[in-house]
Amino acid sequence: MFARTQFDRAWAIAGMIRRMSIYDAAISKLDGTPADLHDYEGKALLIVNVASKCGLTPQYTGLEALQKQYGDRGFSVLGVPCNQFMGQEPGTAEEIQTFCSTSYGVTFPLFEKVDVNGDAQHPLYKELNAVADADGYAGDVRWNFEKFVVAPGGAVTRFGPKVTPEDAALVSTIEAALPA
């Protein structure tokens, strides 16, 4: 045991052991095909757990507006459906895609439905939930439409679900995260 601890310490000191990054999380697109989050590594991202039957669902309009405004500048919204909050995303992948495209004209990428909290929490959200928001809250996602701005290189800024896509602080954070 002692030798193993010394070995681990030596590797950590040498910088060879690193914490998982959000880009390492395995996730699939909404259609079930594997996605590689490393494809987004040089971009500014807005990762949002989304739901179709929530009082905050109209935020899709603002999320799509951000995608249109900044998409050609190295930015993308990533929508991650979740059904953990009062069952407000009960649909199949096909139903979610149809709802988002026909009701809100969503063009940003949508990923598989995942758990953002609890025992079956997706590894992406294990990383994101460790980040505190401006009020110091870190931990479980509180509701649908919690937002995480990820700058190129992986720095994360967290915003609560009631922060709208048009919020000045959110927009300012996105603009600051855009690649040069």
Question: Whereabouts are the PLM-identified features?
Answer:
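Thiol-based oxidoreductase modules, predominantly thioredoxin-like and allied folds used
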Residues: G74-G91, T107-G118
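Conserved helix-turn-beta segment immediately C-terminal to the redox Cys motif
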Residues: K43-A44, K53, T57-V80, S101-Y104
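Amphipathic alpha-helical repeat scaffolds
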Residues: K29, N49-K53
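Short, internal strand/loop/helix patches
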Residues: E94-N144
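N-terminal "domain-start" segment that seeds a small globular fold
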Residues: I13-H38, P58, H122-P123
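N-terminal amphipathic/basic-hydrophobic helices that include classical n-h-c signal peptides
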Residues: M1-R19
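Thiol-/selenol-based redox modules, centered on thioredoxin-like
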Residues: P123-K126, V131-A180
